[in-house]
Amino acid sequence: MTKEDILDIAKEIAPNVDWENGTSLMDDGKVDSFDVVGIAGELMDRYDIEITADDVEPENWNSIDAIYNLVQRKLEED
């Protein structure tokens, strides 16, 4: 898994978001709960991880780096 993989998933689910440059995407309302649910679902399927409601915090979804770090933590939990 790479950040590029995460970026590809995010762009597929929410193509109108500036994922490359965003640092507070959820806080700024550029990423909504529907985007998060779609991305989380794809990440869970692809990487066999569990993303819970507790993980749906802006600090986990504000940028590609944040999403990547979330997935890394989840992979390490297994």
PLM regions and their residue ranges:
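Phosphopantetheine carrier-protein modules
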Residues: 11-30, 49-57, 75
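C-terminal structural segments of small proteins and small subunits
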Residues: 54-76
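Two-component histidine kinase catalytic core, primarily the HATPase_c
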Residues: 35
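Thiotemplate assembly-line natural product biosynthesis machinery
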Residues: 1-18, 69-78
